[in-house]
């Protein structure tokens, strides 16, 4: 069985690629980083280390890699022959890999009618569906019809913290022991594959929103609040009383939405929330505040981790005070080393907070959340 995985970064190697290898797949990584590609091909394996007191290590392999920008013919052949395609490239890169995947699928339709599933394992809602749209935009109507018959794009929700790495071995990757990979079993073409560690579900929405509005929201809240306090790491931030109160308050708010919307009980969600805060406290996982806070324009999007749950709470008649505080803190993130932070501050200087709340967050001045955020900015 061949699994082609786009993205040989830390998530690709330390999470998705590792599980695919352990499930019996011959894993081929597609990336554009020649240094990593050459290392993977030279060694054929790599080490994954658990970020806990035990520091357990396991060797993952055999694997190989190709350059998805320069080895296009080989890439198309792999797509034509693969039993599974996965991605962990970041939401913004999906549109860049859509073109070669589309070309590979055209080749596949000529030689291989076996079902294929393409799973985007990204920090976004509907990643596989989005990738499908990008791919289909590059196909004719006839090609789309042919591919729809045998290619599935199951959406997934992934969760595993991979801290910043400090290893002499460029392939070694440290990951937290906890992980969650949930995949919508109703969206597969053909047989659902047996992948170690995957949870197959009939309704993915609760898992996606629980993860996005707890892990991602909590991480972002800790980062932006920690940055405002001049703290360096997430561990430092979550141990700061005021920051911890801010994070816990935001997760109480998102929890209210999740419990009211889905079948999670209050006790079940509180246990999950406690587990997530415990992950932030793991000193083996401690990440730089500025790294977690980076890309504020994306994270301030109307459906993302801060504005998304806050808007939903407003729709339910609740006032998301802590989430509004988080949005205000994100708007003040001015790290000079982050291009999006620089762009954000330039936008604020040009059009003010009101303009950014409208154009980036999708909030008009008469929205209750708009007013809440402005009140925090004036405080």
UniProtKB/Swiss-Prot annotation:
Positions with a binding annotation for NAD(+): 3-14
Superkingdom of origin organism: Bacteria
EC class of the enzyme, as a word: oxidoreductase
MF terms (GO), sorted A to Z: mannitol-1-phosphate 5-dehydrogenase activity
Matches recorded under InterPro entries: 6-PGluconate_DH-like_C_sf, 6PGD_dom2, Mannitol_1_phos_5_DH, Mannitol_DH, Mannitol_DH_C, Mannitol_DH_CS, Mannitol_DH_N, NAD(P)-bd_dom_sf
Cysteine disulfide partners in this protein: none
Keywords: NAD, Oxidoreductase
GO cellular component, one term: cytosol
GO BP annotation list: mannitol catabolic process
EC numbers, comma separated: 1.1.1.17
Pfam families for this protein: Mannitol_dh, Mannitol_dh_C
Swiss-Prot/TrEMBL catalytic activity: D-mannitol 1-phosphate + NAD(+) = beta-D-fructose 6-phosphate + NADH + H(+)
HAMAP family listed in its UniProt record: Mannitol_dehydrog
Family named by the database record: Belongs to the mannitol dehydrogenase family.
Descriptive protein name: Mannitol-1-phosphate 5-dehydrogenase
Provenance organism: Bacillus licheniformis (strain ATCC 14580 / DSM 13 / JCM 2505 / CCUG 7422 / NBRC 12200 / NCIMB 9375 / NCTC 10341 / NRRL NRS-1264 / Gibson 46)
């Amino acid at each position: 069985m061949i699994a082609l995985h786009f993205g040989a970064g830390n998530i690709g190697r330390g999470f998705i690629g590792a599980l695919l290898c352990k499930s019996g797949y011959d894993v081929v990584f597609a990336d554009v980083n020649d240094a990593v590609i050459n290392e993977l091909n030279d060694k054929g394996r790599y080490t994954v280390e658990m970020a806990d007191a035990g520091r357990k290590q396991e060797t993952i392999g055999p694997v190989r890699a190709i350059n998805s920008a320069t080895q296009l013919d080989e890439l198309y052949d792999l797509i034509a022959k693969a039993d599974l395609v996965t991605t962990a490239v970041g939401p913004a890169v999906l549109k860049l890999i859509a073109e070669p995947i589309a070309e590979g699928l055209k080749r596949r339709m000529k030689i291989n009618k076996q079902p294929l599933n393409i799973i985007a394992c990204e920090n976004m809602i509907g990643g596989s569906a989005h990738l499908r749209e990008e791919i289909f935009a590059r196909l004719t109507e006839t090609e789309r019809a042919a591919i729809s018959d045998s290619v599935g794009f199951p959406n997934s929700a992934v969760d595993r913290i991979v801290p910043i790495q400090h290893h002499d071995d460029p392939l070694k990757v440290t990951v937290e022991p906890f992980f969650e990979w949930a995949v919508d079993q109703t969206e597969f073409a053909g047989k659902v594959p047996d992948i170690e560690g995957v949870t197959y579900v009939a309704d993915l929405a609760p898992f996606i929103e629980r993860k996005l509005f707890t892990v991602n929201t909590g991480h972002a809240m800790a980062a932006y609040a920690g940055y405002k306090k001049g703290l360096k790491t997430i561990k430092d931030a979550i141990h700061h009383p005021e920051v911890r109160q801010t994070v816990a308050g935001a997760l109480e708010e998102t929890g209210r939405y999740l419990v009211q919307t889905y079948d999670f009980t209050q006790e079940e969600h509180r246990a999950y929330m406690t587990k997530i805060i415990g992950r932030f406290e793991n000193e083996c996982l401690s990440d730089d505040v500025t790294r977690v806070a980076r890309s504020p324009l994306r994270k301030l999007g109307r459906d993302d981790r801060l504005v998304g749950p806050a808007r939903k709470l407003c729709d339910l008649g609740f006032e998301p005070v802590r989430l509004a505080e988080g949005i205000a803190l994100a708007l003040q993130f001015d790290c000079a080393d982050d291009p999006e932070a620089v762009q954000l501050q330039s936008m604020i200087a040009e059009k003010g907070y009101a303009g950014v709340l409208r154009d980036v967050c999708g909030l008009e001045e008469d929205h209750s959340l708009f007013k809440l955020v402005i009140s925090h900015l004036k405080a």
